[in-house]
Amino acid sequence: LIWGSSPKTFSSIVGNWSIQLFDGRLIISGVTIVTVAACILIMVVLTLFTTKTRMGTAMRAVSEDKGAAGLMGINVNTTISVTFAIGSGLAAIAGVLLCSAYPTLMPTTGSMPGIKAFTAAVFGGIGSIPGAMIGGILLGVIEIFSKAYISTQLSDAIVFAVLIIVLLVKPDGLLGKHVSEKV
């Protein structure tokens, strides 16, 4: 709406450096290294925040049962606002990292990475921060192997087929815990 539909370029915040391993047979770009390090750091901080702080406990309580959390003295509206702010901040960080890896911006730039991020969260287990990260890594490995050994055009379909298989076999995801509701 503001910039129109023509592609825009985004300069990388990391620069254009890389590390070569195994006599140059494996080249890892600086963007990849920074992205992996940032994801690990964010996962650790978010896990500690949600398990060790009052606000994290409040967030988990509100996500479980809003009414009961309110009756226990938790300010539900504030907790939802903080959760939304954290999610927005994480989305902004993800957007910057994505644009550093793929510097040409179009209106549809984030659609497939967004779908794959949701797929990784479901694959790893909704509600499990480490599960989402492990799900993302496994989906990335599946996608790379399918591109290398099967077909580059079918890699997305293969990733989603694996998701369907996982949901049929283990509906809670790889690290999700099945919780039966008491009536």
Per-region residue spans from a language model:
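Hydrophobic core segments of alpha-helical transmembrane domains in multi-pass membrane transport
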Residues: 1, 36-47, 88-94, 120, ...
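Transmembrane helix-bundle core of multi-pass membrane transporters
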Residues: 1-52, 79, 145, 150, ...
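Short loop segments and helix-boundary regions at transmembrane helix junctions
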Residues: 1-7, 49-56, 61, 111-126, ...
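Helix-loop-helix "hairpin" substructures at the membrane interface of multi-pass membrane proteins
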Residues: 25-105, 129-130, 134
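Hydrophobic transmembrane-helix microenvironments that flank and shape a buried ionizable site
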Residues: 36, 62, 113-116, 153, ...
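Hydrophobic aliphatic residue packing
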Residues: 62-63, 74-79, 96, 119-122, ...
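Hydrophobic/aromatic residues within transmembrane alpha-helices
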Residues: 68-69, 122, 138, 174
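Transmembrane alpha-helical segments in multi-pass inner-membrane proteins
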Residues: 81-91, 101-161
